[in-house]
Each structure stands twice: as structure tokens, then as C-alpha cells.
């Protein structure tokens, strides 16, 4: 084997080792993030659309008194506060009048917060929502959107 072939082989082996180490590091970071979120709770601020019709929008803003809002298919909305349970990825939604509205199960939110999925349990039905944006948006009485930046 010539000197050139040995150099090329060595370069390929080094590149393979580097790529393998990078892959393991990325997997380790994602695993660490998922473990932390499973025990501490995922950051849920943002708004979500239902995955069947995309007509229902569910918004959350934890920093502002744990607010939530659901805008229904007909444009009507329900507002209230939420509270995390002992399982920090299970949320109890209460309307503004204190009446219980439903329960949220946060399935996952990606580390970069560009993907996510949660489930709303209410009136004996389950609706799956997917993350649209991490910028919460709430509808106000006039029908305008109140973008909380």
C-alpha cells in the first residue's frame, strides 16, 4: 500500500470516528433534554392547532399567570388558568369562573421547540394538537389577536 493510500485510509477512519462521536453527543443531549422535561415538565408557551381540521387553536402562556385559551371551530373562545399536577406534563385547565374544563397531556416538545404534540381530554373525547409557534397568541373580545411577544 502506498503512502497516498495510507493517508486516505487514515483520513477516512478519522472522519468516521469524528462523525460517530458527534452523533453520540447529539443523541446524549437529546436524551438528557427528554429526561429533564419528563421530570420537570416541557415548556409549553405557544399556540397549537388540532391535527384533524386545524380549526381549533389552543394557546398557553405560563409566565402570565398560567393562562390558556381555546378558540373553537366557530370562532368562540374559552379562557382560563392551568395548573401542573404532580406529573408536570399533565395540566388541569380551569375556565375563568373556576369550573374545570379539561386535562392536557404534553406528549413532547422538541429541544429546539420547533415540534411538539399535546392531547386535550374533555367531554369524554381526546383531541391531538401540534405546536405551531412558541409565540403565544390570544384572541380578545373584539376578535383581534393579542400577540404576547
List each model region and its residues.
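Hydrophobic residues embedded in beta-strands of well-ordered beta-sheets
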Residues: 66-68, 89-91, 113-119, 126-127
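Membrane-interface motif at the C-terminal end of an N-terminal transmembrane signal
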Residues: 19-34
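An anionic, turn-rich surface loop/hairpin at beta-sheet edges
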Residues: 89-112
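Tryptophan-anchored aromatic micro-motifs
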Residues: 30-56, 82-84
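N-terminal glycine/threonine-rich, aromatic-flanked beta-hairpin/loop signature
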Residues: 51-97
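Edge beta-strand at a domain terminus
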Residues: 32-36, 77-86, 120-149
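N-terminal Sec-pathway targeting helices
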Residues: 1-18
Amino acid at each position: 500500500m502506498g503512502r497516498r493510500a495510507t493517508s486516505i485510509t487514515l483520513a477516512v477512519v478519522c472522519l468516521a470516528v469524528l462523525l460517530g462521536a458527534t452523533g453520540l453527543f447529539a443523541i446524549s443531549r437529546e436524551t438528557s433534554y427528554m429526561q429533564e422535561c419528563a421530570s420537570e415538565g416541557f415548556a409549553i408557551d405557544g399556540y397549537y392547532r388540532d391535527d384533524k381540521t386545524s380549526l381549533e387553536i389552543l394557546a398557553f402562556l405560563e409566565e402570565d399567570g398560567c393562562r390558556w385559551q381555546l378558540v373553537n371551530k366557530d370562532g368562540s373562545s374559552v379562557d382560563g388558568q392551568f395548573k401542573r399536577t404532580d406529573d408536570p406534563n399533565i395540566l388541569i385547565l380551569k375556565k375563568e369562573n373556576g369550573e374545570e374544563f379539561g386535562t392536557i397531556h404534553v406528549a413532547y416538545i422538541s429541544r429546539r421547540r420547533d415540534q411538539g404534540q399535546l392531547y386535550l381530554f374533555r367531554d369524554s373525547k381526546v383531541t391531538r394538537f401540534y405546536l405551531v409557534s412558541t409565540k403565544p397568541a390570544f384572541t380578545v373580545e373584539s376578535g383581534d389577536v393579542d400577540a404576547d411577544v
